[in-house]
């Protein structure tokens, strides 16, 4: 909890989070393959851990680790409760919340709904829902990212006493084969309490959640999440949190750095940053009765940050 609090306080201190704005939060579980002493078998058929990760923009704001063999809904509502309590303690407000179907349960949705304006959660389909889907009329054809979809929405009582909007997206099967339950279409549903936005806006907003996979790819390959160093989950959880802290600092630095001068981009991995900006030979030399940092590089971008009155 202290390291998660440090994550958020560091983001507040660097100006990435503030009390004025409201933020969109993404939540997902990342399965990490590792053969550590206490690693458990996951449903993906490898040993590992299953940390739940919260992301705002490109920043990781909260990490809570779990055994690989635990169900994704196991005590998830309590995890959300701790996360939102930490945000609210720092006066950070959440506008919209996105998650996959692992968060689609009455207890979890009720907890999320308390702390955000709108939520968008991939709904798990059930046999009782198909009758409603097949009888729907008024489908609107929309082209999203070059693919033709048909969109619709209905109000459903997903759980007793709880009525939400269900945004439905269907696409004709590419192979032309008929499915036993879905027929000639593939159906995807989004459960939300947003009753004003259009179906297209909701689908497009939810689809942007896929871009957060790039953050996990960066953490796996650039910050060592796919090569955990310790033998036990508690120690590796500390590693996950510390590398998340470094990742956030790196993103802040790279956003304020003149990246082009160093041959970098804002999307450059930390390895490229280290090679271009840090791994440069330098030596303190005495000249004119004072020490001057002599940097051995042809990159003139170093002249500005290290320029002194001497030269």
Regions found by a protein language model. Name each.
Residues 1-53:
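Active-site-proximal, Lys/Arg-enriched surface segment
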Residues 21-31, 58, 94-104, 119, ...:
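Short, conserved catalytic/metal-binding motifs centered on acidic residues
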Residues 35-41, 62-65, 99, 106-112, ...:
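Short acidic, glycine/serine/threonine-rich loops at helix termini
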Residues 44-90:
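Electropositive, glycine- and tryptophan-enriched low-complexity nucleic-acid-binding patches
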Residues 70-130:
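Domain-level cores of phosphate- or acyl-group-handling catalytic modules
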Residues 118-221, 307-311:
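An anionic, glycine-rich sequence signature occurring as long contiguous blocks
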Residues 199-238, 242, 246-250, 254:
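Short amphipathic alpha-helical "interface-anchor" segments enriched in bulky aromatics
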Residues 250-311:
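A short, flexible helix-boundary coil/loop motif
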């Amino acid at each position: 909890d202290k390291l998660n609090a440090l994550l958020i306080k560091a983001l507040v201190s660097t100006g990435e989070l503030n009390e004025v704005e409201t933020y969109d939060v993404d939540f997902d579980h990342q399965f990490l393959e590792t053969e550590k002493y206490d690693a458990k078998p996951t449903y993906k058929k490898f040993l590992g851990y299953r940390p739940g990760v919260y992301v705002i923009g490109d920043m990781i704001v909260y990490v809570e680790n779990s055994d690989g063999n635990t169900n994704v809904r196991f005590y998830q509502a309590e995890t959300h409760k701790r996360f939102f309590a930490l945000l609210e303690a720092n006066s950070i407000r959440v506008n919209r919340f996105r998650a996959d179907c692992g968060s689609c349960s009455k207890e979890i949705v009720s907890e999320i709904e308390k702390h955000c304006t709108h939520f968008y959660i991939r709904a798990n389909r059930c046999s009782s829902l198909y009758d409603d889907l097949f009888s729907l009329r008024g489908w609107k054809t929309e082209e999203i990212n070059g693919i033709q979809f048909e969109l619709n929405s209905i109000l459903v009582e997903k759980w007793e006493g709880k009525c939400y909007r269900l945004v439905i997206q269907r696409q004709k099967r590419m192979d032309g084969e008929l499915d036993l339950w879905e027929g000639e279409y593939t159906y995807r549903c989004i459960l939300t309490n947003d009753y004003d936005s259009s179906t297209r806006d909701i689908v497009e907003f939810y689809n942007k959640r896929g871009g957060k996979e790039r953050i996990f790819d960066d953490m796996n390959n650039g910050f060592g999440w796919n090569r955990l160093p310790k033998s036990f989950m508690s120690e590796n959880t500390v590693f996950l949190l510390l590398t998340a802290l470094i990742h956030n600092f790196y993103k802040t630095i790279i956003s304020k750095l003149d990246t082009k001068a160093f041959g970098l981009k804002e999307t450059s991995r930390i390895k490229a940053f280290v090679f271009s900006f840090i791994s440069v030979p330098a030596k303190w030399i005495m000249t004119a009765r004072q020490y001057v940092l002599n940097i051995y590089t042809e990159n003139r971008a170093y002249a500005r940050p290290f320029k002194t009155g001497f030269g």
